[in-house]
């Protein structure tokens, strides 16, 4: 994104041209085959929603924007690099990386609230898929959301969230 290597969370910054290209390349291979998606869901933050809007128009698929799919809110750490945070609050940053369920950045969203919000979003997606007879949808969201879903899918504690890889701009 335009803010580069910082904690962006709720910060609503746009993708860079490189980020936009990563997103396009991620779906390009899928577009070589008949598209299996019946709808596209996206976070409301522009780094996801702008690409989702263009893709939904291109594929003529419904687009459902859901604010519950937003990244975790990092509070006072929003827009700061981990180096900046480490210089100011080394103990808190280290504790947060090691056990995020126990340590919350100042004025940030606690991990249990983030988890509840994301689970609520995916329950709604599942409900709408059943109601519309959709078998497959594309969800365009953020690294933290993907990491949390990987934790939940593999029955790992949410404290493993920050140790799980999530490649950006990938399917």
Which residues make up each language-model segment?
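Active-site-proximal alpha-helix that buttresses catalytic centers in soluble enzyme cores
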Residues: 1-61
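Glycine-rich phosphate-binding loop signature in dinucleotide/nucleotide-binding domains
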Residues: 32-36, 125-136
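Short beta-strand scaffold positions
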Residues: 42-43, 116, 140-141
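Active-site signature of alpha/beta-hydrolase-fold catalytic machinery across serine-
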Residues: 54, 148-152
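Phosphate-handling substructures
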Residues: 59-119
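GST superfamily/GST-like fold recognition
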Residues: 143-147
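Domain-level recognition of soluble alpha/beta enzyme cores
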Residues: 156-171
């Amino acid at each position: 994104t335009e803010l580069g290597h910082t904690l962006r969370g709720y910060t609503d910054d746009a993708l860079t041209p490189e980020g936009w290209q990563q997103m396009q390349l991620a779906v390009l291979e899928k577009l070589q085959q008949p598209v299996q998606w019946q709808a596209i869901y996206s976070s409301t933050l522009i780094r996801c929603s702008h690409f989702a809007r263009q893709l939904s128009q291109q594929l003529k698929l419904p687009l459902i924007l859901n604010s519950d799919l937003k990244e975790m809110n990092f509070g006072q750490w929003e827009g700061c690099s981990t180096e900046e945070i480490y210089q100011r609050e080394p103990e808190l940053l280290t504790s947060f990386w090691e056990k995020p369920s126990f340590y919350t950045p100042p004025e940030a969203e606690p991990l249990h609230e983030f988890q509840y919000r994301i689970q609520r979003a995916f329950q709604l997606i599942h409900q709408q898929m059943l109601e519309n007879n959709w078998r497959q949808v594309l969800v365009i969201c953020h690294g933290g959301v993907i990491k949390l879903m990987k934790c939940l899918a593999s029955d790992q504690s949410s404290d493993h969230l920050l140790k799980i890889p999530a490649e950006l701009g990938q399917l």
